[in-house]
Curated annotation (Swiss-Prot):
SUPFAM superfamilies: FMT C-terminal domain-like (SSF50486), Formyltransferase (SSF53328). It comes from Geobacillus kaustophilus (strain HTA426). Belongs to the Fmt family. The keyword Chaperone does not apply. This is Methionyl-tRNA formyltransferase. It catalyses: L-methionyl-tRNA(fMet) + (6R)-10-formyltetrahydrofolate = N-formyl-L-methionyl-tRNA(fMet) + (6S)-5,6,7,8-tetrahydrofolate + H(+). It holds the Pfam family Formyl_trans_N.
Length: 319
């Protein structure tokens, strides 16, 4: 019996853990991030992987710093023959990487060596790619740089968001792992080194990247909006007030105007000029301190003061 330790944290990792269990593998322990305080009461909320592991009766470890000996030794106590990771969120120490008989493998949501890092799904859409995928590779001390064991492509639809693509890639990763593990354990797979010259990176999203740059082409802004939907959500400003822009669509600009100019106020949309002939019609937004709403509702209320010719995104944030 192969003794497996699974390491993962968010929703992306849950179908992958389920696949291991459904395929009959023995998952001796699950390692995940600590519970995080959320909401107004700041009550601790367990990671999705912890919830699934406890539902299945699997021991759970939640190290704060996996690289510290007293913490990674708790993992080694389970004597793993193989460690499988998926969006765990911490860099593993050499002592863990070297311990399992079959090594440590990672299910990564990109076609490596493209988009190494913590936000490959966001960047795949943001960069306007028409395909991405999942790679299973050996883990090494460098970020997502290990030899590849398997890879599968997943097309990106023009209407995909980070949410929909996340689910497609998670399912594809679970299926690919199911197909790859028997080959790995039987020694019937040949690892392929990554081409370092083709490596690109997808670092974790920063707050300043959420702001829409209206000087960009309309196509790029549309990709930005859907790449940040439903998390962390793009935003713009109007007269110093923040609007979260939950959704928008590409439309031909009715006339020429400086980027960020409101070109039209429609029943269900605010049409905004961009850096080219493709405008963006905002259809769903969330003013600061308010609920998420359709633009039609906004224009009948707080947005009734808006007028064609007003500018978005050029002022300092107040709220």
């Amino acid at each position: 019996m192969t003794n497996i330790v699974f390491m993962g944290t968010p929703d992306f990792a849950v179908p992958i853990l389920r696949q291991l269990l459904d395929d009959g593998y023995h998952v001796a322990a699950v390692v995940t991030q600590p519970d995080k305080p959320k909401g107004r009461k700041r009550e601790p909320v367990p990671p999705p992987v912890k919830v699934e592991a406890e539902r299945r009766g699997i021991p759970v470890l939640q190290p704060t710093k996996i690289r510290e000996p007293e913490q990674y030794e708790q993992v080694l106590a389970f004597a793993p023959d193989l460690i499988v990771t998926a969006a765990f969120g911490q860099i593993l120490p050499k002592a863990l990487l070297d311990a399992p008989k079959y090594g440590c493998i990672n299910v990564h949501a990109s076609l490596l060596p493209e988009l190494r890092g913590g936000a490959p799904i966001h960047y795949a859409i943001w960069q306007g790619k028409t395909k991405t995928g999942v790679t299973i590779m050996y883990m090494v001390e460098r970020l997502d740089a290990g030899d590849m064991l398997a890879q599968v492509e997943v097309p990106i639809a023009e209407t995909d968001t980070v949410g929909t693509l996340h689910d497609k890639l998670s399912a594809a990763g679970a299926k690919l792992l199911s197909e790859t593990l028997p080959l790995l354990l039987e020694g019937n797979i040949a690892p392929v080194p990554q081409d370092e010259e083709k490596a690109t990176y997808a670092p974790n999203i920063r707050r300043e990247q959420e702001r829409i740059d209206w000087t960009q082409p309309g196509e790029a802004i549309y990709n930005h909006i859907r790449a940040f939907h439903p998390w962390p959500v793009t935003y713009t400003t109007q007269d110093g007030h923040i609007w979260k822009v939950w959704w928008g669509e590409k439309v031909p600009a009715p006339r020429s105007a400086p980027p960020g100019t409101i070109l039209a106020l429609e029943e269900n949309g605010i049409v905004v000029a961009t850096g080219n002939e493709t405008a963006i019609r905002i259809t769903e937004l969330q003013p600061a301190g308010k609920k998420r709403m359709a633009v039609g509702e906004f224009l009948r209320g707080a947005g009734s003061r808006l007028a064609v010719g007003m500018k978005l995104g050029e002022d300092h944030e107040r709220t």
